[in-house]
Each structure stands twice: as structure tokens, then as C-alpha cells.
């Protein structure tokens, strides 16, 4: 038996595929690999696969990970090519390899963030946003698992921010906590609306670039 991990890109139209539909897409694709995927027990067995740190709908990523098990011994070579033969536009498997690192080692994520302004970027926006996201405390309202609103200080979850001022957008890179607890970079827009409403963007784009361990090394 082998535990394997896929590295894949999710972008363009595929960024709007829900988590459940993404799982179904891979479940339909696995027969092309000719691997014997480990299945659940019961009346309706299905392939046991899990996506590491599922991506919020509407965001794109260069570093999505999916874990699964097969009954035979394999190192995963050649699997990516077989899966890509029938993947929908915007999904592309880059690699398949043994899943040696536990998911608990995943600590941070690096993402590109673009805050777009239809009428041009307000003066001093990049500097003001940098100051906002480096505050010692930054409280926003966030929905809990019970769907209630609660005040949450997201400042401890923000590790790095770098922003540049453009004509119609502020672009930058952020490193935020990935889990226990994790911070969805989309919530940065909510923090802007709450604390610097004049700088609230008209649209926000997020692209996840890398998953990192606690030492800042790339997690695979």
C-alpha cells in the first residue's frame, strides 16, 4: 500500500469549482491511472481522497495538494500525465509523489493579493495598507462554525505583507497562518472595510503561491 500526494494548479474557470465538485472531478479521473485506489466501506464505496487546505471558491492556486492511498506499491511516476488527459480547463496536475510529510507540518501560506480600484488607487494606499496589516492588533468580525459573528484578532495570523502602488490596483504578497487557526487572505478585504473604509477595493483577487512549514520552507 502507498500513500500518494498530488500537486496541482487550480485557476481560471476551475477556481469557481466547489470543494465537493473538485473531489468528484478527481474521483472520475482516477480510473485513468489504472491504480487501485483505497475505497470507503459500506453500500456506496467511493475513493478515499482528501484535499489539503481546501481553496476558497473564487481563488486560484499554484500549489494545491490532494492525498490518496493505493493498494499497490508505487512512487507515483507517470500518474500526473494520465490524470491530465481528461482534466477540465483550469485544472492541471504537476506532480504525484509519496506523501511523506504529515499535514500537521503545514504552517503558513504565501499568496499574491490584488486590490483593484475602478476609479484609480487612492493616494498613499499601499503604505496605509502595509501599516494596517502590521498593527499589533487587528480585530474583524468573522463567522464561527456555528454561523455566529465573533470578534477575531487576525494580527497574530499575519506573518508578512508587501504591497506596491499601481494605477488601478495595489498588488502584493502576504504570508498568513494556514491552520490552527488559519486565515483566509480574502478576509484582508474585510479588515480594510472595517478599519480603512475609504480604501475598500472594488474587487480582490487572491492567488495562492506556496504552502510553507513552520521554518518557512516549501511544504510538499
Regions found by a protein language model. Name each.
Residues 15-20, 73, 77-78, 123, ...:
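Ordered, soluble secondary-structure elements with a strong preference for glycine-centered loop motifs
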Residues 62-114:
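Ordered, amphipathic secondary-structure segments that act as subunit-interaction surfaces
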Residues 13-15, 23, 27-32, 36-41, ...:
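Short Lys/Arg-rich amphipathic alpha-helical segments
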Amino acid at each position: 500500500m502507498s500513500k500518494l500526494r498530488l500537486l496541482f494548479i487550480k485557476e481560471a474557470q476551475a477556481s469557481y469549482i466547489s470543494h465537493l465538485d473538485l473531489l468528484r472531478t478527481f474521483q472520475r479521473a482516477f480510473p485513468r491511472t489504472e491504480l487501485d485506489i483505497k475505497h470507503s466501506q459500506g453500500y456506496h464505496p467511493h475513493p478515499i481522497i482528501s484535499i489539503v487546505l481546501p481553496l476558497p471558491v473564487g481563488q486560484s492556486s499554484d500549489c494545491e495538494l490532494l492525498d490518496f492511498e493505493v493498494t499497490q506499491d508505487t512512487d507515483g511516476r507517470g500518474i500526473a500525465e494520465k490524470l491530465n488527459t481528461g482534466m477540465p480547463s483550469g485544472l492541471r496536475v504537476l506532480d504525484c509523489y509519496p506523501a511523506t510529510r504529515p499535514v500537521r507540518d503545514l504552517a503558513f501560506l504565501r499568496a499574491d493579493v490584488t486590490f483593484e480600484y475602478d476609479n484609480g488607487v487612492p493616494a498613499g494606499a499601499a503604505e496605509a495598507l502595509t501599516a494596517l496589516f502590521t498593527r499589533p492588533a487587528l480585530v474583524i468580525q468573522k463567522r464561527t462554525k456555528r454561523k455566529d459573528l465573533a470578534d477575531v484578532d487576525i494580527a497574530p495570523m499575519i506573518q508578512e505583507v508587501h504591497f506596491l502602488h499601481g494605477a488601478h490596483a495595489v498588488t502584493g504578497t502576504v504570508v498568513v497562518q494556514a491552520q490552527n487557526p488559519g486565515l483566509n487572505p480574502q478576509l484582508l478585504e474585510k479588515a480594510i472595510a472595517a478599519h480603512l473604509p475609504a480604501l475598500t477595493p472594488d474587487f480582490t483577487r487572491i492567488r495562492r503561491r506556496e504552502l510553507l512549514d513552520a521554518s518557512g520552507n516549501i511544504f510538499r
